[in-house]
Amino acid sequence: MSIEFNALNFKKVALAAQDKLPKLALINLDDWGLITLIGDDKKSYLQGQVTCDVVSLPINASIFGAHCDAKGKMRTIFRLFNHNEGYGFLQRKSVMEIQLPELKKYAVFSKVDIEASSDVLLGLSGEQAQAVVEQHFPGDGDVRVITAGTAIKVDDDRWLFAIAPEQAEQLINTLVETHNNVQLSDSTLWDLYDVLYAIPRIDAVTALEFIPQAVNLQAVDGISFKKGCYTGQETVARAKYRGINKRAMYIVTGEATQFPFTGDALERSVGDNWRKGGTLLASYLYADGQAIALVVLPNDLDEATQFRLADQPEAIWTQLDLPYSLDDK
């Protein structure tokens, strides 16, 4: 059966909090956007704009980074990889309108073309994802050239495809016809993986609110402290060497009567009272009413601190362990 590439074919996979994740899912990442950078000066231009070391990016790997303002506040967090004749710059679609003009601001002085891409973004997730990629796109490395696009390994359970629109439908049908257990999902399943793996993100509602260390970007190798100057570097360096950062990103979980949105406020318990605690960056609401989220909080809280959503005060939330260390490497 041929499947037309239509967002309506990709629906939320109903999962309870105790359910196992699908063994294989194809995800429509329509909440994400891609910028491409092409030209002789693409590497040097981007190197002076972002927190990661673009110069050291291997051809077969991807890295995290942030694009900050002069005060070190992040406009966006992105995943960077080699794509077609240049770079692919993956970020949340909601920040594209405010971030792209800033990234292009000085491009007129360099040999670099920076544009929003029309490529379709698809995710492949689950314990079978790696084997499926090896079957259809064999090769070495975590970034692979495929027909009309690129395949990028995100983590042990996920691959990302950035592919031309005319090839997207063919890819979908190939995977559906070859693997009868593949589930088609909307982007909420990708959100769940990002929360479980504590992958930071910035949306329009949280843009220019946080410095990179406040969302653990250093813990996912998204900051180079050895590269040359870039916009916002002074603040990022002070946060590391002078300890000015007082926040971090954590995983929290609890019951929710309605979907918790990015930018929602989380309150924390202080004795018998409640005070503003932090800001929600990403979340997933299970079918049984449990929710899990990434939240920026003060980094000196007791692990026993309780939380609640400001607009849903009846449900108590608690903190979960991060999958990585926040200690300096």
From Swiss-Prot:
Folate binds at W32, W190. GO terms for biological process: iron-sulfur cluster assembly; RNA modification; tRNA processing. Its main location: cytoplasm. Keywords: Cytoplasm, Folate-binding, tRNA processing. One of its GO terms (cellular component) is cytoplasm. It is found in: Cytoplasm. It comes from the Bacteria. InterPro entries: GcvT/YgfZ_C, tRNA-modifying_YgfZ, YgfZ/GcvT, YgfZ/GcvT_CS, YgfZ_barrel. GO terms for molecular function: folic acid binding. Signal peptide: none annotated. Folate-binding protein involved in regulating the level of ATP-DnaA and in the modification of some tRNAs. It is probably a key factor in regulatory networks that act via tRNA modification, such as initiation of chromosomal replication. Belongs to the tRNA-modifying YgfZ family. NCBIfam families: PRK09559.1, ygfZ_signature. This is tRNA-modifying protein YgfZ. It comes from Photobacterium profundum (strain SS9).
